[in-house]
């Protein structure tokens, strides 16, 4: 019998007997464990061989045998839990231990660096599962980061300085305003072993042609081996950067036939997905990666929803030794903001917008927040920390305003906290705030009726590119803000848009109301090198490494 199963049987027996040695019979014990008399005898003999108990059998009808426990079920449970932790079987650990506080304590004690069988393993604690990693779908901040570790694209944007770099394409050139040519590397392999072909690249880029920022791609052809020509319907100075974004990452052309591709995707990036469940995401360095192999062999993201209630609990990778703790932080390039929905009467009413943005001002939100949040929130007066576009102007409450509907996406504790503060403030003005909490896909499409939406945006480098690209990618914003998005996209592609002025107009009209900038924090270890937090609050796994202990 496998050791894990035997341990479970012993723990169950110990619990049924309340840990007390006693006189009993095989039949009674077999009934406790719901097994045959013969199997019970085998179990007892095996457990006795392990030194967990003694079984002094008495022969004869009516005679009772002596069962003596030498080991406690709690001790064995702890040993089993340690084994499950080492094997990264978090789902089984939760079932075994049951108590969430105990599970959390065990997980935290095993965070950070681990060195096993010559492999460097990084363990990270996160507050929610990362189940959808499909490029081109509605991805949140953390899923966007993980997708960049799994997939490659024609180009890549350096997370630290925002500069454009080669990826699958080693060079490219603009033949004409409507014609670009990319030269691709041969010998690139997918995680499932197949070599990348031009058809994979063409299929991957054609599948995103329905997205607003890629709708101007007219044709994609390969005139010669490892050469890709992209023809446009309008000029686009940003095209090389656009092809380095997550939607444009390269998938195997048969991706739709592969089982559970969204949660277990296959790319050509530095890490391959080994496991992805509600309790854990495990990715492993891809030995056949065409670039520099990752220095950390394995990254395990353990999911513990309970840390969502901790303001700074977004990403933890510190070990148990307090003296090794090191904190990396940065003010996010983006903010929480209110989005007024022009499709509803109250959302489109300028008086409502002016008054709501006045009473729910950034300073009011921070004032009514608990101290733990005040330390992490910074009043926002623009979509970026460097911008000061919003002005707080006193406004009178519109007559007849009695209720408003606010919608945000779930699995985000700070959304609930901010919404609760808003509810409290509006109630003091005799306005009822009705709150809807929906899943991220529903939020992204924006097809639910709501007066106001509570959103957050994290922009990546370079900001001149990503601010408009991010806002234009979200269907919800296009539904709520009645401007000519296509005309603005054309101006942006031509380099004719003043981005700061464009964003200032959105803020001035109260279509978008910046609320709070958030401090992004990683709780790390001093022994880790190359850990540089990006604008998404994560770090590039393949560039991080562990310094060996001093000799």
Curated annotation (Swiss-Prot):
InterPro entries: SBP_5 (IPR039424), SBP_5_dom (IPR000914), SgrR_HTH_N (IPR025370), Tscrpt_reg_SgrR (IPR023767). Gene3D superfamilies: Periplasmic binding protein-like II (3.40.190.10). Keywords: Activator, DNA-binding, Repressor, Transcription, Transcription regulation. Signal peptide: none annotated. Residues 1-116 form the HTH marR-type domain. GO terms for molecular function: peptide transmembrane transporter activity; transcription cis-regulatory region binding. Residues 163-492 are annotated as: Solute-binding. GO terms for biological process: negative regulation of DNA-templated transcription; peptide transport; positive regulation of DNA-templated transcription. CDD domains: PBP2_SgrR_like. The keyword Ion transport does not apply. Disulfide bonds: none annotated. It holds the Pfam family SgrR_N. Residues 26-49 bind DNA. It comes from the Bacteria. The keyword Manganese does not apply. Binds specifically to sgrS promoter in vitro. Activates the small RNA gene sgrS under glucose-phosphate stress conditions as well as yfdZ. Represses its own transcription under both stress and non-stress conditions; this repression likely provides one measure of control over sgrR at the level of synthesis. Might act as a sensor of the intracellular accumulation of phosphoglucose by binding these molecules in its C-terminal solute-binding domain. This is HTH-type transcriptional regulator SgrR. The gene is sgrR.
């Amino acid at each position: 019998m496998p050791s894990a199963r035997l341990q479970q049987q012993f723990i169950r027996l110990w619990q049924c007997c309340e840990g007390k040695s006693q006189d009993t019979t095989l039949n009674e014990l077999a009934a406790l464990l719901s097994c045959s008399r013969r199997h019970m005898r085998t179990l007892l003999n095996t457990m006795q061989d392990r030194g967990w108990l003694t079984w002094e059998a008495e022969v004869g009808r009516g005679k009772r045998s002596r069962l003596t426990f030498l080991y406690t079920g709690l001790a064995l449970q702890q040993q089993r839990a340690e084994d499950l932790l080492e094997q990264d079987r978090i789902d089984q650990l939760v079932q075994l231990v049951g108590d969430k506080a105990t599970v959390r304590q065990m997980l935290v004690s095993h965070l950070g660096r681990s060195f096993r069988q010559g492999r460097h393993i990084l363990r990270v604690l996160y507050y929610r599962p990362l189940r959808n990693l499909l490029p081109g779908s509605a991805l949140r901040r953390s899923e966007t980061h993980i997708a960049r570790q799994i997939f490659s694209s024609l180009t890549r944007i350096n997370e630290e300085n925002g500069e454009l770099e080669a990826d699958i394409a080693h060079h490219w050139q603009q033949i004409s305003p409507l014609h670009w040519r990319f030269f691709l590397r041969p010998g690139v392999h997918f995680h499932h072993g197949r070599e990348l072909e031009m058809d994979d690249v063409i299929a991957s880029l054609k599948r995103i042609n329905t997205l607003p920022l890629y709708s101007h791609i007219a044709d994609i052809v390969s005139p010669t081996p490892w050469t890709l020509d992209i023809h446009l319907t309008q000029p686009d100075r940003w095209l090389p950067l656009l092809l380095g974004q997550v939607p444009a990452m390269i998938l195997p052309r048969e991706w739709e036939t592969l089982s559970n591709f969204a949660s277990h995707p296959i790319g050509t990036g530095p890490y391959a997905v080994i496991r992805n469940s509600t309790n854990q995401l495990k990715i492993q360095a891809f030995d056949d990666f065409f670039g520099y192999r990752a220095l950390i062999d394995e990254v395990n993201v353990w999911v513990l929803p309970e840390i969502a209630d901790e303001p700074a609990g977004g990403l933890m990778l510190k070990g148990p030794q307090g003296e090794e703790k090191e904190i990396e932080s940065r003010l996010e390039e983006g903010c929480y903001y209110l989005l007024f929905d022009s499709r509803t009467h109250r959302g489109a009413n300028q008086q409502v917008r002016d008054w709501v943005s006045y009473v729910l001002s950034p300073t009011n939100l921070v004032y009514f927040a608990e101290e733990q949040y005040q330390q992490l929130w910074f009043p926002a007066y623009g979509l970026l920390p460097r911008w000061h576009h919003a002005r707080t102007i006193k406004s009178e409450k519109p007559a007849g305003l009695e209720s408003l509907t606010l919608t945000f996406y779930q699995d985000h504790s700070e959304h609930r906290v901010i919404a609760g503060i808003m509810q409290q403030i509006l109630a003091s003005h005799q306005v009822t705030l009705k709150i809807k909490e929906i899943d991220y896909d529903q939020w992204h499409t924006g097809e639910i009726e709501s007066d106001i939406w509570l959103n957050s945006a994290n922009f990546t480098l370079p900001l001149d590119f990503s601010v408009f690209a991010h806002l234009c990618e979200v269907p919800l914003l296009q539904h709520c803000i009645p401007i000519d998005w296509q005309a603005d996209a054309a101006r942006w592609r031509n380099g004719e848009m003043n981005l700061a002025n464009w964003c200032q107009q959105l803020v001035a009209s109260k279509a978008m109301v910046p609320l709070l900038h958030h401090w992004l924090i990683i709780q790390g270890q001093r022994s880790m090198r190359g850990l540089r937090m990006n604008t998404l609050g994560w770090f590039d796994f393949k560039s991080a490494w562990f310094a060996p202990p001093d000799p």
